[in-house]
Amino acid sequence: MPTRSLPTFLTLLLLASIDWVSKLVVLLKSCQLSPHSSAFLYSYVWGHFSFLIIPSFNEGAAFGLFAQYKIPLLIFRVCVILGLALFLRIKYKSLHRRTRIALTLILAGALGNVGDILLHGKVVDFLFLSYYSWRFPSFNLADAFISIGTLLLIGHLYFTKESKKCF
């Protein structure tokens, strides 16, 4: 591995590890709850906004989609990870720094969720946001990495003059 791509690789491993450790902590803490305690591990309420840590499981893709296609979904996810990793490796020098950061975030999130599927057979979600009666589906840090990476990539592609140099 060239030394130029080493920071990207280490960042990828660090982010995936942070995701896995956060899920492990939530699962271990939820095992310590007594049957008579509330289902959430943490709550913060500010006016009509609330943030909760509630362990839940997702057997499908985003928002539980395609849960009935576990094996094809896993194969698709692994192919996406391998494709992204290969693309990042081959094009590393020619990619704009923002593109590398975005792809690293997406790849770290994908690795985090695939690690869950291989370990638990489903993805561990635990972050829950609500505002008034609006409730966002629960998610995890890997999902946040994927979302932030995607937004960075879209922002770079559409809103910068250098977007033609992106790939």
Curated annotation (Swiss-Prot):
This protein's UniProt keywords: Aspartyl protease, Cell inner membrane, Cell membrane, Hydrolase, Membrane, Protease, Transmembrane, Transmembrane helix
A Gene Ontology BP annotation from the UniProt entry: proteolysis
Catalytic activity: Release of signal peptides from bacterial membrane prolipoproteins. Hydrolyzes -Xaa-Yaa-Zaa-|-(S,diacylglyceryl)Cys-, in which Xaa is hydrophobic (preferably Leu), and Yaa (Ala or Ser) and Zaa (Gly or Ala) have small, neutral side chains
One Gene Ontology CC term in the entry: plasma membrane
Pfam families: Peptidase_A8 (PF01252)
Molecular function as annotated in GO: aspartic-type endopeptidase activity
Membrane topology listed for this record: Multi-pass membrane protein
Keyword Membrane recorded: yes
Function: This protein specifically catalyzes the removal of signal peptides from prolipoproteins.
Protein name, UniProt field: Lipoprotein signal peptidase
